[in-house]
Structures are given as C-alpha cells and as structure tokens.
Swiss-Prot record:
Site (Reactive bond) residue list: D41, V42, D100, V101
SUPFAM superfamilies associated with the record: Kazal-type serine protease inhibitors (SSF100895)
Gene Ontology terms describing biological process: effector-mediated suppression of host innate immune response
Glycan attachment residues as annotated in the record: N67
Keywords: Disulfide bond, Glycoprotein, Protease inhibitor, Repeat, Secreted, Serine protease inhibitor, Signal, Virulence
Protein's organism: Phytophthora infestans (strain T30-4) (Potato late blight agent)
Lineage, highest ranks first: Eukaryota, Sar, Stramenopiles, Oomycota, Peronosporales
Secreted as UniProt keyword: yes
Extent of the signal sequence: 1-16
The UniProt record lists the keyword Electron transport: no
Disulphide bridges: C35-C65, C39-C58, C94-C124, C98-C117, C106-C139
GO cellular component, one term: host apoplast
Protein's name in the database: Extracellular protease inhibitor 1
Length: 149
C-alpha cells in the first residue's frame, strides 16, 4: 500500500514538472511596458518628476500603469533619487513625502532627522547648506547653528 502511494506521488510530481503541462511565459513586445502586479516592500524611495514619491521603483511603475489618467510613457519618466552623500537629485523639484519609518540620522548641520529620506528633503530644499549624513557630530532635536571657527 505504501509503495503504491509513493509511486502515485512520484508520477504526480514528474507530471507536474513536465514541459507539456507548464505553459511558457508569454513573450512581450519590445515596446511593451513592465507593469508589475506585486512589489517587494523594500525602502528605496524614488520620485516621478511630478512631486510624487514612491517606496521604490516597482511601486512607481505599478502606480503609473494603474493610473488611467496618466498613460505610462517610461521614455519621458525622470527618476528623482538622492543620497545621504549630498548628491542632488536631477530635478529641481524636491520630494515632500517620506514613508513613516523611524530610522534616525544626524545631518552635518547637527539636526536629527527621522530617517534618511527626511535628510534628503532638507538637503534638496537647502542646497546652500550642503547637508549630508554625519555620524561624527552630536545631533540635537532642533536646529542648531554650527559653530564658526
């Protein structure tokens, strides 16, 4: 009885892996746009040039694909990214929205920001301050004018 059950399971497993049972993935045209149904919750914020910020590029693509008022035209899409090294995004429009994630960082201006995204917004809005992430300085809860010296 056990060998019959084992044989049935093996046959079912082999049949399930058979190329005749598994249909090939449909081929996409070269001009067809990638419209993901699901995205990983990975925090790597991007902006779309219209002031919208998304958790990552996948969520941005998904939003653009499902927004019927905005046809997805990836050729005209400008990604806005920043970094904690003071690099400015390629657009003059600064993002204003950050995910509600508590991951405190200290800026070179001695201001404590709730997360790296908030630091990037401050750096974008005040490029003259050249704000970057700085773990070597003491951070405070409110803005402190740096000591001149």
């Amino acid at each position: 009885m056990k060998s019959a059950l084992l044989f049935t399971l093996v046959v079912a497993a082999v049949h399930a892996q058979s190329p005749q049972v598994i249909s090939p993935a449909p081929r996409r045209e070269s001009n067809e746009i990638d419209c993901p149904e699901y995205c990983l919750d990975v925090y790597d914020p991007v902006g779309d040039g219209e002031g919208n910020t998304y958790s990552n590029e996948c969520y941005m693509k998904r939003a653009k694909c499902h927004n019927e008022t905005t046809p997805p035209a990836w050729k005209d899409l400008v990604l806005i990214t920043g970094s904690s090294t003071g690099e400015q995004p390629p657009s003059k429009k600064c993002s204003t929205v950050c995910p509600d994630v508590e991951l405190p960082v200290c800026g070179s201006n001695r201001v404590r920001y709730g997360n790296p995204c908030e630091l990037r917004i401050a750096a974008c809005e005040h490029p003259e301050l050249n704000i970057v992430e700085d773990s070597g300085k003491a951070c405070v809860g409110s803005k402190v004018t740096p000591q001149e010296g």
